Amino acid sequence: MEFAYAKETDKYVANAIISSGLIATTAQDNTAAGLLGYAAQAAQLVYSNSLGFARNIVVSPEQWANIMGYNDSGRPIYNASQPQNAGGQVGPQSLRGNVAGLDLYVSRSLSALTYTTGDGSMFVINPESYTWYESPRLSLRSDITATGQVSVAYYGYGALATKVANGSVHFNKN
């Protein structure tokens, strides 16, 4: 139940951030060059609109796989130990990494929102623009003596506060 609760809250936050943020004004191809163009433009838009720096990029698992596969003449850009053209560090052993100077996070909720590798499949964010507030979670159990069953309920409340408008920019696929 804890996992189901976490999935739903993650999906809620991802959807709220995407719907309240900006879309990149220039559509980019879903390539290594497109990723760098998007990251540069998104960082500029976040700073221009929120007066804070873009520090994170959140991607769907499908985009994570794309980023790990980006290469330059067969040499991996993000997934090698000593690359000559390192653009960051992304690997299959962690859902965290670094892409173009932004901290990378992978969220399966972006796939659940039907964003896989198109618009909304990743967003660059100034984390100071949003805050997630959450109550302690409570699990209630009650025995149903007539049938021998146990009823379990899991409660928690949360809210996302947008502190600075337009603190995120999501991908605009060409």
Task: Describe each model-derived feature in a short phrase.
Residues M1-N49, H170-N174:
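Alpha-helical scaffold segments that mediate packing/assembly in large oligomeric complexes
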Residues E2, A6, S109, Y155-Y157:
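Residue-level marker of positions within ordered structural domains that often coincide
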Residues D10, R137-N174:
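Protruding loop/beta-arch "assembly-hinge" segments enriched in small, turn-prone residues
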Residues I18, E62, Y157:
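An acidic- and aromatic-residue-enriched active-site/binding cleft used to recognize and process polar
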Residues I18, L104, V152-Y154:
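Hydrophobic alpha-helical segments involved in membrane association or supramolecular assembly
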Residues D29-V150:
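Extended oligomerization regions of viral-like shell subunits
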